[in-house]
Amino acid sequence: MSRYHTFTAADAVEYARQFGQVADPQALVTADEIGDGNLNLVFKIRDTAGISRVIVKQALPYVRCVGESWPLMLDRARIEAETLLTHSQFCPQHTVKVLHHDAELAVMVQEDLSDHHIWRHELIQGNYYPQAAEQLGEYLAQTLFHTSDFYQSAQAKKAAVSRYTNPELCQITEDLFFTDPYIEHERNNFDPVLLPEVLSLRQDKALKLAVASLKHRFLSQAEALLHGDIHSGSIFVADGRLKTIDAEFGFYGPIGFDIGTALGNLLLNYCGLPGLAGPRDAAAGREQRLNDVQTVWQTFAARFLALSQEKAQDPALATEGYAAQFLQHVWRDAIGYCGSELIRRTIGLAHVADLDSIDDQEMRRACQRHALSLGRALILVAPHVDDVGGVVARIRQSPSSLTPQRC
């Protein structure tokens, strides 16, 4: 098999036998399609005992929920595989292992993570993994530092920026994050009862100026090789372990984007918890989410600083105090992108179960309103914040009262 064709289950089994790196390839006999996304086919390859051994993932040449009228380039499969391989080079313990990939077939074979669980599902169910936030911070620090100008040579970095140019998937992000939620668009999806809040966002000139700045940075700042879609649904967890998957949105962009989207998903769970659990469990879970937000940032920042002191290759960027100064700019970006994630996941095309799975309609609407107000506040306060503790304290005291003053 060399020319592109859409895999059947039988094709996936045969491919896994060739490239799955299992000791007994002929024992691989069945493939279950498990993908619930719109861009790919994903198969679990099982052996004669019914045990899942490897994953086969193939990119589709169109958006699945729309059909061939929305075509996509298959090169995104190469970008995803190479992003995961690069991230695995610097943080193998927290990156899914790529066993094989073929750019022409737009297919990749990955390790099976059946002994892990999707973090979003675990957060919704109230299952706490105390090491996950620290591990996520470590992953972000290792991958973003080692693909940045602090570590890469200027020549290597410029070549990598070109190699990881990902225009179609970046366009999706640009539209869904920074454009659609602030205009009337057919892709937007929200409860009509929320229309007053939606119209208020569209009419808020200060907010739209701040979002324009975030979008401009996303378009123009090639700071490091991002995962590009790091959220609690693209993170698998187990006791003491964490693995990231699904890096097809990978590209060179602003470091704060990966951090902000990760933090945004923790805060989406924070907003949804009153509708997902009883009062006592919701209060405890919300405190955990705020602690997780602090831990992710503090771990990332401390590790990034340590790496810059140990490994910074550029003598100018190694100047004492510069990395800390740079991280202030990253932090402010992260808070803005965090707010963007809250808004777009509430009223845009792609929602999250942290809000949408709330059974009680009035409670769900209240949680969605909270997400919108918190997202707006974070975007507006982002240029004025100095540290994570100040932001978390304000969220804890009064979730909707963030104002553009220094924290």
From Swiss-Prot:
Keyword terms, alphabetized: Amino-acid biosynthesis, ATP-binding, Kinase, Methionine biosynthesis, Nucleotide-binding, Transferase
Top EC class of this enzyme: transferase
Amino acids binding ATP: N40, K57, E111, D112, L113, D246, A247, E248
Entry EC no(s): 2.7.1.100
Binding, substrate: D229, R344
Catalytic reaction annotation: 5-(methylsulfanyl)-D-ribose + ATP = 5-(methylsulfanyl)-alpha-D-ribose 1-phosphate + ADP + H(+)
Pathway noted in the entry: Amino-acid biosynthesis; L-methionine biosynthesis via salvage pathway; S-methyl-5-thio-alpha-D-ribose 1-phosphate from S-methyl-5'-thioadenosine (hydrolase route): step 2/2
GO function terms (MF aspect): ATP binding; S-methyl-5-thioribose kinase activity
Biological-process GO terms, alphabetical: L-methionine salvage from methylthioadenosine
InterPro entries with a match to the protein in the record: Aminoglycoside_PTrfase (IPR002575), Kinase-like_dom_sf (IPR011009), Methylthioribose_kinase (IPR009212)
Description of how the protein assembles with itself and partners: Homodimer.
NCBIfam families assigned to the protein according to its UniProt record, in alphabetical order: MTRK
Task performed by this protein: Catalyzes the phosphorylation of methylthioribose into methylthioribose-1-phosphate.
Entry similarity comment: Belongs to the methylthioribose kinase family.
PANTHER family (UniProt xref): METHYLTHIORIBOSE KINASE
HAMAP family: Salvage_MtnK
Name this polypeptide is given: Methylthioribose kinase
Originating species: Yersinia pestis (strain Pestoides F)
